[in-house]
């Protein structure tokens, strides 16, 4: 199993939200949260001019070692039942539990009690 991320490891910092060109001018474009590559001949973002929003590049990607980890440095696991909890009880040092949003209150309380018994950490109590 992998070890939790070390404290001296480079943290991802604040993620840049890459917005589409002219997203603030048109409601139709502003609603779309998806990046599209600018293709215009004089487009300032495509030309990477100073003062304009950054263009998507591979250099913004997080390190492989910490990609997908919880901010605590633990690997998040989605849990929907007590059976799932027991499956991850063995490698509990490097795992943090996330209870599924579709779980009701009664089952959620049951999962929290079981996780505390097994000594597992829960991200969304």
Curated annotation (Swiss-Prot):
The record's comment on protein family reads: Belongs to the eukaryotic ribosomal protein eL32 family.
- Tree of life domain: Archaea
Please report the name of this protein according to its UniProt entry.
Large ribosomal subunit protein eL32
Record the organism: Sulfolobus acidocaldarius (strain ATCC 33909 / DSM 639 / JCM 8929 / NBRC 15157 / NCIMB 11770)
| GO terms of biological process kind | translation
What is the name of the gene encoding this protein?
rpl32e
Under HAMAP family, the record lists: Ribosomal_eL32
Assigned keywords, A-Z: Ribonucleoprotein, Ribosomal protein
The protein's matches in NCBIfam families, at most eight in alphabetical order, are given as:
PRK08562.1 (NF006332)
Give one GO molecular function term.
structural constituent of ribosome
Keyword Nucleus belongs to the record: no
Annotated InterPro entries: Ribosomal_eL32, Ribosomal_eL32_arc, Ribosomal_eL32_CS, Ribosomal_eL32_sf
- Coiled-coil stretches noted in the UniProt entry, renumbered to this chain: none
Q: Name one GO cellular component term.
A: cytosolic large ribosomal subunit
